[in-house]
């Protein structure tokens, strides 16, 4: 379906939605300041009504949801039996329905899996994109839109990142966290409200920002995302996603054993790093670009952006063995550029359990 934002002056769109309106850096600044709203055409909405919805989602996912209060935002992961991330979603409940906001590329697979896992429980997950869209911004910015209220409660998800949620665990050891000042929320709106937003922007009554601005602010906050930062091997530990998407003290769910083992007894095999890229040529690496130490490839870029204050930045996943002070380079279309590494997940992440060490008896002593 054609975007309602396509006719706006300067609008640049692709299949994911509105990328920008001609000034991505200005849009970033205004979005961060609470002066702009971003249409999130790359998101999808899944509705999960039914009396058993929260206990059912709790049993299937990494998050504790049974006692989730209406209007409180959290996020969940669906893991495979080996603990790898398969799906991710933001979730807010209105007292009658759990509303999942997902990356559009993940929505079909997540919905199919949820429908397969219903059994005889009182749940009925369905795609809700025909009825609803998603817009994002600071909490104050979203006061300019009218969220959907199907059960009388506004459908607004407030991003918990980077605070460590109950039952979570943060690996990034920096203080303050670069996302500490990030104020981000997403509102589910009706399609009529989406059209009103577009009309208000065309009339100059509302300022919009595109997805390019949204992603740059996300990368600067070290915030992982399914579309860009998850591959078939991704563990939540590697992305510091344990802080908001995993509850370590809840009941059993698929993949929990691996989550607990890596966190308590081992180390994640890879780790997320933030990169400050050489900005002399303003060339950004593409998704999947090689990260190197010397000539050896030690990881890949997952997200890259041109930030309005920090310049060219990126997130990358590298081997755990890469030294925290290693000199890194990144492949680009114009050649190799240097990259200064900032540690997000340290090499010693995990192994949090205090395992008692028993004195070892010699063979002679044990034989006596």
Regions of interest found by a model, annotated:
Residues 240-246, 256, 260-368:
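Glycine-rich, small/acidic residue-mixed loop/short-helix segments
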Residues 187-276:
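Anionic-ligand-binding alpha/beta catalytic cores of soluble enzymes and soluble regulatory domains
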Residues 70-73, 152-169, 222, 227, ...:
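Glycine-centered loop/turn motifs
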Residues 50, 100, 137, 255, ...:
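Residue-level signal for inorganic ion chemistry
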């Amino acid at each position: 379906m054609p975007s309602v934002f396509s006719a706006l002056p300067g609008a640049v769109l692709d299949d994911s939605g509105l990328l920008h309106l001609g000034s991505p850096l200005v849009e970033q600044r205004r979005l961060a300041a609470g002066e702009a709203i971003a249409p999130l055409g790359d998101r999808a909405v899944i509705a999960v009504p039914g009396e058993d919805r929260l206990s059912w989602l709790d049993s299937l996912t990494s998050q504790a949801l049974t006692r989730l209060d209406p209007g409180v935002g959290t996020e969940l992961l669906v893991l495979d039996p080996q603990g790898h991330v398969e799906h991710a979603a933001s979730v807010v409940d209105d007292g009658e329905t759990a509303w999942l906001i997902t990356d559009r590329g993940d929505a079909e697979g997540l919905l199919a899996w949820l429908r397969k896992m219903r059994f005889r429980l009182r749940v009925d997950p369905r795609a809700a994109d025909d009825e609803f869209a998603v817009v994002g911004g600071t909490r104050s910015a979203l006061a300019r839109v009218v969220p959907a209220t199907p059960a009388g409660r506004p459908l607004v998800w407030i991003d918990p990142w980077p605070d460590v949620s109950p039952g979570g665990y943060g690996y990034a050891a920096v203080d303050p966290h670069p996302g500490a000042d990030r104020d981000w929320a997403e509102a589910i709106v009706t399609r009529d409200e989406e059209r009103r937003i577009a009309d208000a922007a065309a009339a100059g009554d509302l300022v919009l920002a595109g997805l390019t601005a949204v992603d740059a602010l996300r990368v600067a906050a070290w915030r992982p995302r399914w579309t860009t930062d998850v591959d078939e091997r991704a563990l939540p530990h590697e992305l510091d996603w344990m802080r908001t998407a995993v509850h370590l003290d809840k009941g059993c769910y698929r993949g929990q054993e691996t989550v607990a083992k890596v966190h308590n007894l081992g180390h994640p095999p890879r780790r997320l790093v933030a990169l400050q890229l050489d900005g002399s040529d303003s060339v950004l690496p593409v998704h999947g670009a090689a990260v190197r130490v010397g000539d050896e490839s030690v990881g890949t870029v997952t997200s890259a952006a041109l930030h309005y204050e920090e310049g060219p930045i990126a997130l990358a996943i590298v081997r755990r063995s890469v030294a925290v002070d290693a000199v890194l380079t990144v492949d680009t279309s114009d050649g190799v550029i240097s990259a200064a590494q900032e540690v997000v997940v340290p090499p010693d992440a995990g192994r949090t359990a205090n395992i008692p060490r028993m004195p070892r008896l010699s063979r002679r002593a044990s034989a006596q």
